[in-house]
Design a protein with these regions (language model features):
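N-terminal pre-domain/capping segments
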Residues: 2-134, 164, 225, 286-292
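Acidic/histidine-rich catalytic cores of soluble enzymes
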Residues: 60-62, 163-249
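Aromatic-rich peripheral "rim/lid" segments of glycoside hydrolase catalytic domains that contact
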Residues: 273-292
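Alpha-helical scaffolding within the catalytic cores
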Residues: 46-48, 74-79, 119-124, 185-189, ...
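H/E-rich (His + Asp/Glu) clusters that bind or coordinate divalent metals
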Residues: 245-269
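Hydrophobic faces of well-ordered beta-strands that scaffold small-molecule active sites
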Residues: 31-34, 61-63, 90-95, 136-138, ...
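Acidic-and-aromatic substrate-binding clefts and catalytic sites of carbohydrate-active enzymes
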Residues: 38-44, 64-75, 98-102, 113-117, ...
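Active-site acidic/histidine proton-transfer and metal-coordination neighborhood
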Residues: 10-12, 16, 21, 101-201
Length: 292
């Protein structure tokens, strides 16, 4: 890929390069995996599945909730140490913003209660102490009406302060709903304007943003440096199904070429519960790896 391959031959070029895709870099950037990709199988054999991810060459890990609670049945330190032993870096952790409301058909009856930012922000942050995690990510939060968006701002602002005090960075992960008008406003715009950038960054899901008709590059330009993380997610024609990264219609090269504007540091492949997660990650590594 052509990112960070920008030769700085003069001070003028250097001064302007912040707003241009960088095009020269010394080594490929590490690829990561959002473990929700393996939600259906990970808990059955955590060490074995994490070994498979490492064997594919992935280096960064982003965790999410699991069926068995904790960090895939482990303490945070145990999970952090497991990643280290496999040569991987546990970078970030996903949590929900408010009490979890499963979608229809998603059985959570046998799952333990999930902590959320509204009620448990301090406990969540405390649980990550001593691990390699640098980012705490709000995976979703109710934004169905103006009142919910207002409450979301309050929750995220408070959580951002708690995260910062512990040396963590709070990010918000989007779906497509954040870019829809709700009572005359878009939740993404409200979060951007009403929550200071030092309290909230964004993990832009490139697939969902594209599905919403949003140009990620324009988002980067509007808020340079506010997107340290991204989800590399792909869709088929018509956005009916999520497909392995790089095999669908999202123009990842164009987006990733502009990642220096975004301030992007970590890139996580995500494919929501595919039939064969390892196969999807294998395809994603092959397709996206050359772009990094």
């Amino acid at each position: 890929m052509q990112r960070r391959q920008f030769l700085h031959r003069s001070s003028a070029l250097l001064a302007g390069s912040f707003f241009l895709p960088s095009v020269l870099h010394a080594a490929p950037r590490p690829m990561g995996v959002q473990l929700f990709t393996l939600f259906m199988t990970l808990d059955q054999d955590v060490k074995g599945n994490m070994q498979k991810i490492a064997d594919l060459g992935y280096k960064d890990i982003e965790s999410a909730f699991s069926r068995v609670g904790g960090f895939y049945g482990m303490s945070a330190m145990e999970f952090s140490d497991l990643n280290k032993s496999l040569g991987m870096n546990w970078v970030s952790h996903h949590v929900v913003g408010a009490p979890f409301k499963p979608r229809p058909g998603f059985d959570t009856s046998k799952m333990p209660r999930m902590n959320n930012l509204r009620d448990d922000a301090q406990a969540i942050v405390d649980s990550l102490k001593g691990t390699t995690v640098k980012y705490l990510v709000c995976a979703n939060i109710p934004i169905g009406n103006k009142s919910e968006v207002t409450e979301a701002v309050q929750i995220l602002t408070k959580a951002g302060k708690i995260a910062n005090a512990a040396g963590l960075t709070l990010c918000y992960h989007n779906h497509d709903k954040e870019f829809e008008l709700v009572d005359g406003q878009k939740a993404f715009d409200v979060f951007s304007k009403e929550i200071p950038a030092d309290l909230l960054k964004f993990e832009l899901d490139l697939g969902w943003a594209t599905k919403a008709g949003v140009d990620p590059v324009e988002l980067f330009k509007a808020q340079p440096g506010r997107f340290p993380l991204c989800h590399i997610k792909d869709f088929d024609e018509g956005f009916k199904n999520i497909v392995p990264a790089g095999s669908g219609i999202v123009n990842f090269k164009r987006i990733l070429d502009a990642s220096s504007i975004a301030g992007m540091k970590h890139y996580f492949i995500e494919h929501d519960m595919p039939k064969d997660a390892i196969e999807s990650l294998t395809i994603g590594k092959k397709n996206i790896g050359p772009l990094l």
